[in-house]
Amino acid sequence: MKTPDNPIRQKRLVGLWAFVIMSLGAVVMVYPYAYMVGASLKTRKEFATDKRSLIPPRFQIGERLKHMRGEDSALAWEGADWPVLKNYVDGIVYGQVDVFLLNSLIYAGVVTVIQLTVNALAAYAFARMTFRGQGVLFSLLLATMMLPAAVLLVPQFLVVNALGLVDSFWGVVLPGFAGAFGVFLLRQFFMNIPGELEHAARLDGCGSLRIFWHIILPLSKPALITLGLFTFMAGWNSFIWPLVVLSDQAYYPLTVGLSLFREESGADWPRIFAASVMGSLPLIAMFLLAQRYLIGGISLSGMKAQ
């Protein structure tokens, strides 16, 4: 008669397999970024000679020993004395990466602040107020989430052109002032806030705006941080719309500036990778600072409202 497996052993096996799968997934996700960082520290000749290695030759012990003994090595040409951060410095001095980074920061920051304000007010109206056609309007709002961004590109450009905002700061940020996903996310979160708090505030003489500012928003910090992070990331990574609406290089964000940088540098990949690493640092910093709110905001917003 076959005895059942030990439950503790089964639990350990499941945990082991889960660890292995997650470790493989982590390697798949981290490897491209590690490759980009390693390539950004190489010279142009080093990258052309060895595109596969993650570690530049100057950091490899074997190549260092060969160079010290006078043997033929990858450090025999300009690699030994090449400053480690030269690609980063050249990107700022010659490639205007600092200007592109500042533009991206301004665009993403302004869009995030305005979209949080507009979406929070709209979500509060859908979640806490009752008016005629509320369900129909909300359904139409959700339907806009099914439209591909490419479909809206021409109508948005026509509107921006009619307003005379082509090739300007406001022309870039105007289409991002509101979003259906943000309204939906915040509405779901607002509907989970106990209604007794709002009723008690109204008994004390608070109006709708005061309730929104002093009760709803403070209790919705996880959802607001989550939406702010998603909005900032979308604005930071935006490429097609700035490319369409801008022609002055002084207004270029980093995403568009990188394509220009590639043409000017003659496909100097180490320098391009260095600019890409600099462009990724703000998003990484934001995720590290807001990660404890991220999962909570999404999970609580997805709960069924009572």
Regions found by a protein language model. Give the residues of each.
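A structural signal for multi-pass alpha-helical bundles of membrane permease subunits
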Residues: 2-306
